[in-house]
């Protein structure tokens, strides 16, 4: 995903983040989710309940003030790109949220991550404004089903 962002001309994830330590931390906190094919991990994301300090201050407005799941660090193995797997993961996340009676999903991405911007809009996420993440502004999105 880091190399794909670079080849797309995006500045997102070009500073050594995310790295193995970040993923290890996600897993130790039970935030990490994997998409597998057989015994091979082909996708990854972090899902965090109600805990993203950067989302407390938004230039704009969230759609809701209810509990939410933050979606971070979605990545697909290079040899599985173009198969709609990020969409599959987002659909699964929506189902997981519904099972937990959570109606709000939030995500952010760089202004130049065209693929993710397109997918979030395609999947019904609404642009809510800008948040500061790791020293830079990000476009913030929410999908609310309440």
Language-model features: locations:
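Conserved beta-hairpin
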Residues: 31-48
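Hydrophobic adenine-recognition pocket in adenosine-nucleotide-binding enzymes
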Residues: 74-76, 109
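Conserved acetyl-CoA-binding loop-helix of GNAT-fold acetyltransferases
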Residues: 76, 82-95, 118-122
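Conserved GNAT-fold acetyl-CoA-binding loop/helix
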Residues: 2-22
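Conserved active-site alpha-helix within GNAT-family acetyltransferase domains
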Residues: 87, 99, 111-129
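C-terminal "cap" of GNAT-fold acetyltransferases
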Residues: 64-65, 122-123, 130-146
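Conserved acyl-donor/pantetheine-binding loop and adjacent beta-alpha core of acyl/acetyltransferases
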Residues: 46-73, 81
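Conserved GNAT acetyl-CoA-binding A-motif
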Residues: 90, 97-109
């Amino acid at each position: 995903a880091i190399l794909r962002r670079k080849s797309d001309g995006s500045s997102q994830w070009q500073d050594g983040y995310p790295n193995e330590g970040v993923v290890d931390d996600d897993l130790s906190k039970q935030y990490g989710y994997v998409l597998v094919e057989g015994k091979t991990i082909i996708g990854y994301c972090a899902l965090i309940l109600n805990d993203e300090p950067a989302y407390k201050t938004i230039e704009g407005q969230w759609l809701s003030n209810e509990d939410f799941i933050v979606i971070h660090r979605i990545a697909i193995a290079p040899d599985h790109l173009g198969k709609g797997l990020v969409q599959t993961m987002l659909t699964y996340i929506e189902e997981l949220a519904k099972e937990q009676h959570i109606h709000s999903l939030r995500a952010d991405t760089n202004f130049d991550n065209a693929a993710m911007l397109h997918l979030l809009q395609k999947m019904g996420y609404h642009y809510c404004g800008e948040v500061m993440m790791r020293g830079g502004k990000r476009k913030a999105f929410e999908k609310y089903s309440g």
